[in-house]
Amino acid sequence: MRHSKTAISFFILVAVLGSQAGLIQDTVKEDRPFNPTIIHQGFQDSSDCCFSYASQIPCSRFIYYFPTSGGCTKPGIIFVTRKRKRVCANPSDQRVQTCISTLKLGPRSGNSAIA
């Protein structure tokens, strides 16, 4: 008889604690509403952004250029070589402005960010 009282007391205790744990978990879920992370860069063409500028600008190796998109953190001009390599340049640099005046504005293509 003593074991049955202990067992019943134990099951009542487990039932009470279990229901309390469920209430606490529901309260915690209600306190933190679902706020999905929004990544704004997905809507911008970050593949055509410059993160650094080349120090040497050999105009004779470039076939065309295009400016970076407006969503980039740094302004830039991307020059494309005959071998289709891309070179980022500072649009404020006088040498870059000279290259721009001699080259044609080209298409914006490719999917890799420029370092």
UniProtKB/Swiss-Prot annotation:
GO cellular component, one term: extracellular space
UniProt KW ATP-binding keyword: no
Localisation per UniProt entry: Secreted
Disulfide bonds: C49-C72, C50-C88, C59-C99
UniProt GO MF annotations: CCR chemokine receptor binding; chemokine activity
One Pfam family cited in the UniProt record for this chain: IL8
Gene Ontology biological-process annotations: antimicrobial humoral immune response mediated by antimicrobial peptide; cell chemotaxis; chemokine-mediated signaling pathway; inflammatory response; osteoclast differentiation; positive regulation of cell migration
Signal peptide: 1-21
Keywords: Chemotaxis, Cytokine, Disulfide bond, Secreted, Signal
Entry annotated with the keyword Amino-acid biosynthesis: no
Main location: secreted
Stated family: Belongs to the intercrine beta (chemokine CC) family.
Listed name of the protein: C-C motif chemokine 6
Lineage start: Eukaryota, Metazoa, Chordata, Craniata, Vertebrata
